[in-house]
Amino acid sequence: MDIQLKETSSYAREADIDLSWEEIAADFEQAIKQFSKRVKLPGFRPGKVPRKVLMKQFQPAIEADFVEKSVNTYYLKALQEKEIIPINMGSVSDVHFHHGEHFKFKVAFEIEPDVTIPKMKRKSLKVEKTNYITDDEDVDMAIDEMRHGHAEVQTVEDGAQLDDYVICDLQEIDTSGVPIIGKKLETRYIKLGQIPFDGDNQKKLEGIKPGEKTQVSVPVDEKGSTSTFELSVQNVERQILPEVDEDFIKMADPEAENVADYRGRIKDRLGKAYDQRSEKAFDEQLTDAMINHVNPEFPPSMAESYLGHMVEDVMKNNPAATDKEKIKEIYQPVAERYLKWYLIRNTIIKNEEYEITKEDVQADIDQRKEANPKEAKELEKYFKKPSNRSRLEDDLMEKKVLAYLKNFTKIKEVKMNTKDLRKQSEGNVQS
């Protein structure tokens, strides 16, 4: 077999495959026998038609059948011989074959490209790292969240107040007050004072009681268009929050000694959570900086395949997401970023000869168990599953690659108060 490879881009290849008649004669004879079993000729039993008769009457059909069934076989042999792993289905063209002659054809396919990493200097990459500074309001909010989780719910008969929950039906009505058929929302929970039941809607709902009705204006699309709904109250509920006393602290955090200690422990946990948030954002910016530095080419088929899987997952997990083309448009940049990083990462792993051993994985699991002794058994059980160990192995490799990139990164540390984050969040909600 003669194989001529042509490189048409960093990821595209074209193979010209040429097999002599001597190499394929035996396979062609086998094709004749298989064809004979399927053909029906008067005076002959299936499989017993003489070769000469078959070739005289059906040679073009036999040749076409042979080509169709053999191209893939010889293509795979050529790939094995050249030690090539394609990432897509090859596109076959220029097929030439007749009995007694060479069998020639061409296949265009894509491979995972080799990525060239430019020479890295000490400050090749520039990345910001945000260090968050928490405050007492963060602690208060965390405690309030815990209190809401253990609140006692009471039915209210004397009228709704701010922060009460109104259980109601919402019937959309037209400008004349007539209900619109098919536009009724039943048994909805709304919180008084929470968007969109603030402002004018809040004033209408304050003091409302079970059995009463009012009209509210509610946004119905992303553009902010509103419709009028008749709101019928089924019930009003109020959350009675527990006091932050010794009993509450024992229930919320048995290891806390008193209120001050409880608040301190919450502040520590919040600090660790914000540190993790900071590290995650930094890692994403670091990979983005490296992607921009290298900007590798990627095979279109690879991107299309990965994007297809992403779209399937989105539609599977979100039944309301039905516009496939819109989802593809949204997630295409995400898929392309992932593939660029995947190619860069693999190149670094190969160049630096990185590996993650079983001992590395077990050491990380042991470290997790030591840090969380109460969850040691659960962790052991979780990481017995091969897919979870494989995911951990991949995470450890990611950390190793990112640690390598930090050697070539100028890091600008910036401080951000969490109160500024809260202001940003409030601004986003209002806009």
Language model region names:
Residues 86-94, 142-163, 211, 269-272, ...:
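Phosphate-interacting basic helix/loop segments used at nucleotide- and nucleic-acid interfaces
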